[in-house]
Amino acid sequence: MPTWCKTFLARAGIALVACLLAAGQTNAQTRPALVIAVNSVGSKLDPADTPLATELKIFGSIFDTLIKRDYAAEARDPGGGAILVPSLATSWKRINPRTLELQLRQGVKFHNGDELTADDVAFTFSPERIFGTNAMLPSARQFLRCLDPVEVVSRYTVRIRSCADDPTLELKLAHYSAAIVDKRAYLSLGQAGFKRAPIGTGPLEFVEWKSGDYIKFKAFDAYFGGRPTFQSVVFHEVPEAAARVAGLVSGEFDIITQVSPDQFSTIESNPDLQVLPSLLEQMQMLWVVATEPVVADRRIRQAMAISIDREKIVSTLWDGKTNSDNQFQLPTLGSVYDGARKGFQYSPARARDLLADAGYKGAQVTLRVIGNYYVNGETVAQAVQSMWQAVGLNTKLEIVENFTQAYAPGAAAVMGGCGFEYAAPESLGSCFFGDQALTRQRGFPKGIPGMEALAQQLATMDQSQRKQVFQKILDVFENEVPAIPLFRTPQFFAAKRSVHWQATPDFRMDLRPDNLSFATAAR
């Protein structure tokens, strides 16, 4: 509180309101004006509009979901599975295998002052917006699958129904595509207007967007999760990695994204800076184009998978700051995870035997990677090329400009990724099973043999049965080899040491008050 206020109150005991207002203004000014450098600010900020990773980083603190994952608690209990906690919903219960009833948090405000009600939830998941024939954003169905129209029980109670039995419904409601939007604002602005001037319930309130330059937000002090610890946040677009690091070193930026391992030493040599790592629930992998004659025999694909020394790649190219992965499961899957599973174990000798059994005669195996797209992408591809050549695979590496070139005829394998969008086997569907699975475009046009029937069996609510089914799915993966897992996809941020913030296992930057604080006052 300003000194003049203390003196005035001591002498007169009046003008309390004016003094408290002045104190509030002073406190607001002492909060930091946070500046974050990102490689891109993207072009849209609608959570259901298939956001890019760069857009996810920004809108993660604009919107909230009904349920959220407690990543901090999960970190304290690795292998314990996903931990779900209240967010915009204070509680929920299963009515039946298809239906959840949720109680909404009362008094929650959107940035425009509207109160969150059941009508906003119903609109968010409506046929008009996502699930109808002429929906605005049908692409969100790849994550949310199929939901019936929301039943509004009362102003603060809703029932959300899946179109079929769904043991993952709670997890889907914690997914970023399930973030709740303001019905009135959305319809007033239209989808095109809303995605450029978003209105949510989170701690970031939109102020200004200059395309290709920056997006500015101010603190939403009415945020239901507590008063934000910042005064404002600006996301600056800085495409060049070296420029982001230079800006952090100079003090221009507080946090930077997309830090590569070769920049660690520059940052860590400065006592005022820190590298902040996070492992995404995503795997860097190689898609295998099984329609290419040279890899049509599954034994050759199996040889490709077991001839890669993942530990060596992680230790030499990632400084040990990620995990090697030789199978498509993660501990966050909880009860369906099998920690004893061996996956694609490194065995060059066995790989050579498989190639001999398949009658491989030295045909060219073309590996493609998009240049300057994945951190360390070309270097990892070169390592894989060398390992394949070591077991006798005649491997040619091609660096291309885009995905169209990557999947042009001739590719036997292409570097890519696949993530657990939510902590359940079903979230692999967009990659490996279902009519829209990427594998249907990338080597298995009729689907992976045996996969679809197993995927349908995941709908059971019996967790032991789900585990058995999922482990059979992994058996199919290891037999057919539609893709070859390499390692967990890491993401690296860097920040001033005065910034106390933890990156999460998804792309969203969580700037809520329980995850962001500062050791010093604002500049």
Please tell me what each predicted stretch does.
Residues 323-357, 371-378:
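Structural transition elements
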Residues 299, 390, 394-405, 428-497, ...:
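Extracytoplasmic/peripheral linker and loop segments enriched in polar/acidic and small residues
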Residues 29-30, 93, 103, 109, ...:
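Surface-exposed binding/hinge segments that line
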Residues 493-523:
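Long beta-strand-rich cores associated with HINT superfamily self-processing modules
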Residues 90-134, 159, 244-247, 294-296:
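Aromatic- and charge-enriched surface segment that lines or borders ligand/interaction sites
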Residues 192, 220-266, 385, 394:
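Ligand-site clamp/hinge motif
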Residues 70-75, 79, 83, 155, ...:
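Gly/Pro-rich hinge or "lid" segments in bacterial periplasmic/extracellular proteins
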Residues 37-96, 126, 197-200:
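N-terminal lobe/hinge region of extracytoplasmic solute-binding protein
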